[in-house]
Amino acid sequence: MNLTIPFAKGHATENDFIIIPDEDARLDLTPEMVVTLCDRRAGIGADGILRVVKAADVEGSTVDPSLWFMDYRNADGSLAEMCGNGVRLFAHWLYSRGLVDNTSFDIGTRAGVRHVDILQADQHSAQVRVDMGIPDVTGLSTCDINGQVFAGLGVDMGNPHLACVVPGLSASALADMELRAPTFDQEFFPHGVNVEIVTELEDDAVSMRVWERGVGETRSCGTGTVAAACAALADAGLGEGTVKVCVPGGEVEVQIFDDGSTLTGPSAIIALGEVQI
């Protein structure tokens, strides 16, 4: 039986998502539905889906049941713990549609609560700052891409990352690099990993490309930009700082502190409609 449901399409530094409002938790969103909707030829097309639901209606949620919960799904249908770009768009949706009253509020995720501040917003665009928590450095590891081995820093942002700062790599050379699915240490990353290839820190900025677990290469990855900033600062012998992270989809600002991190960047809601699934 076909269901007709409302949706919105949006992106945060061109990491694009389908927003599915499900405030009454009536939709049984299956992996097959997610794959179909995210298909860029046969569906709407997106890097993932953000289902808008209360935490009380999410199985296994450990956050305050009254919070709005970002039920995030990767394009392959798998559940995901956290998405920094997705949180910005999710917060933009909640605020612009009147589902929250304040510009500062909490959002539930599978990685726990994330606090957000709406710095500017209208129905179409926003600038949002997200409290990303303390980056958990898990150690050093490597990956192989196209036969080239990259050494990197394991960083857990609620989801696993391997941020590889490459000595001497320029932004133009990074842009020209052929990025394919990496092979990695599955004992170190038993649940898979998001891999970032990062230039060295220069003038408080880095460039980054990312291969996301369950998706492939994306134009941006919010948690990945925090992992990249953390790795670039460590590579430069620094424990904290503010880093501009340039991704194919735009720019974000990451701040790393002793006791946490923030991610600030844009969000855009570009379409509203209905879809049959």
Curated annotation (Swiss-Prot):
One of its GO terms (cellular component) is cytosol. Keywords: Amino-acid biosynthesis, Cytoplasm, Isomerase, Lysine biosynthesis. GO terms for biological process: lysine biosynthetic process via diaminopimelate. Substrate binds at N15, N74, G84, N85, N159, N194, E212, R213, G222, T223. PROSITE patterns: DAP_EPIMERASE. InterPro entries: DAP_epimerase_AS, DAP_epimerase_DapF. It is found in: Cytoplasm. GO terms for molecular function: diaminopimelate epimerase activity. It catalyses: (2S,6S)-2,6-diaminopimelate = meso-2,6-diaminopimelate. The active site is at C83 (proton donor), C221 (proton acceptor). Its EC number is 5.1.1.7. The record marks H161, E212 as: Could be important to modulate the pK values of the two catalytic cysteine residues. Gene3D superfamilies: Diaminopimelate Epimerase, Chain A, domain 1. Disruption phenotype: Cells lacking this gene are unable to transform L,L-DAP and show an impaired growth when supplied with low ammonium but high concentrations of carbon. Pathway: Amino-acid biosynthesis; L-lysine biosynthesis via DAP pathway; DL-2,6-diaminopimelate from LL-2,6-diaminopimelate: step 1/1. It is an enzyme of class 5 (isomerase). Disulfide bonds: none annotated. PANTHER family: DIAMINOPIMELATE EPIMERASE, DIAMINOPIMELATE EPIMERASE, CHLOROPLASTIC. Catalyzes the stereoinversion of LL-2,6-diaminopimelate (L,L-DAP) to meso-diaminopimelate (meso-DAP), a precursor of L-lysine and an essential component of the bacterial peptidoglycan. Involved in the succinylase branch of the diaminopimelate biosynthesis. Homodimer. Belongs to the diaminopimelate epimerase family. NCBIfam families: DapF (TIGR00652). This is Diaminopimelate epimerase. It comes from Corynebacterium glutamicum (strain ATCC 13032 / DSM 20300 / JCM 1318 / BCRC 11384 / CCUG 27702 / LMG 3730 / NBRC 12168 / NCIMB 10025 / NRRL B-2784 / 534).
